[in-house]
Curated annotation (Swiss-Prot):
Protein name per UniProt: Inhibitor of apoptosis protein
Subunit composition and interactions: Interacts with subunit p17 of host CASP3.
A single Gene Ontology CC term: host cell cytoplasm
Keywords, comma-separated and alphabetical: Activation of host NF-kappa-B by virus, Host cytoplasm, Host-virus interaction, Inhibition of host caspases by virus, Late protein, Metal-binding, Modulation of host cell apoptosis by virus, Virion, Zinc, Zinc-finger
Keyword Zinc-finger assigned: yes
Job description of the protein: Prevent apoptosis of host cell by inhibiting caspase-3/CASP3 activation to promote the viral replication. Also induces the activation of host NF-kappaB.
Residues annotated as binding Zn(2+): 62, 65, 82, 89
Family: Belongs to the asfivirus IAP family.
Domain of life: Viruses
Amino acid sequence: MYPKINTIDTYISLRLFEVKPKYVGYSSVDARNKSFAIHDIKNYEKFSNAGLFYTSPTEITCYCCGMKFCNWIYEKHPLQVHGFWSRNCGFMRATLGIIGLKKMIDSYNDYFTNEVSVKHKNRVYTHKRLEDMGFSKSFMRFILANAFMPPYRKYIHKIILNERYFTFKFVAYLLSFHKVNLDNQITYCMTCGIEQINKDENFCNACKPLNYKHYKILNFSVKL
């Protein structure tokens, strides 16, 4: 989860002031809960408790400061992310207090450095990897922009991971085994990457005996 406009308050203001919410209609937790519930979003309480309400499938908004966040649906710590990017939000100040907000930001800095920045590097790495593999620019934009978003997750399914989402680095890893060109709907063998195969297969006839056991353990496939 990250802000739609990539800005960050560099300090926490010590001035005491009253903040009028930008979206008064979502000031109550019930109103924010309802914004998620009517769109059949599950486990939405952590977002509404963080002062956020549903805007679109790719965007949520803080009712108080008005900051918008993208790629939010699998975020585990929305309160921390909200406080990290919007340090002078009236809701965050009222919820945690200035001292509590400072402590939370300090603890979140490690997560942001080790997780978020690494994912950004993986994104850049994946673009270069896909380019080297001969994929078109339109396909690379498709992967990088929509890898986490439904309905595009159906293209890469049955992925066994500890988390519910996969990183961009894993996309590159998967595609290095199974070369798929969405532009002309051609699928290649997961092992040799040379022989063309049917859409419902994973290996060419020559590679099937060598990879059947490995495929059963890894348990992923690509569906077009």
